[in-house]
Amino acid sequence: ALVALGHLSGEPRYVEAAERAVRRFGPSIVESPGGYSTLLEAAHDLEHPPAVVIVAGPAGAGDAGNGEAARWMLALQRSYRPWVQVYRQPRHDAPGPLVKGAPPAVGARAWICRRMTCLPAVDDLAALEAALSRVEPG
């Protein structure tokens, strides 16, 4: 979680904290990997950073689950991409320091990020799917 938080927030200290934790527990991980699955996942994400998709948009009229952004989330979940993490930006919050542009007033918008760099916003689900088809594993 620290790796993803660091990449989403643009705060290297979170990534550095994850690196320290993995190094600190390295010998224990080798002895008993089953007991350290979360740290193994962090080590993997440090070595092979996943792409992160941030989906933003207002909720649907009267129902937070029926907006365009919710439809995009469902569409993105249909594809198997273990090297891509998808997050829904809550309400009208700013999408974070790494992305350029504001959440849309209507419809949906998404950003694809890796490490601490985000591509320009995508305002079309088909274009987002096409861009994700070109994203390689970390």
Question: In which residue ranges do the predicted regions lie?
Answer:
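Glycan-recognition and catalytic cores of secretory/periplasmic carbohydrate-active enzymes
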Residues: 1-138
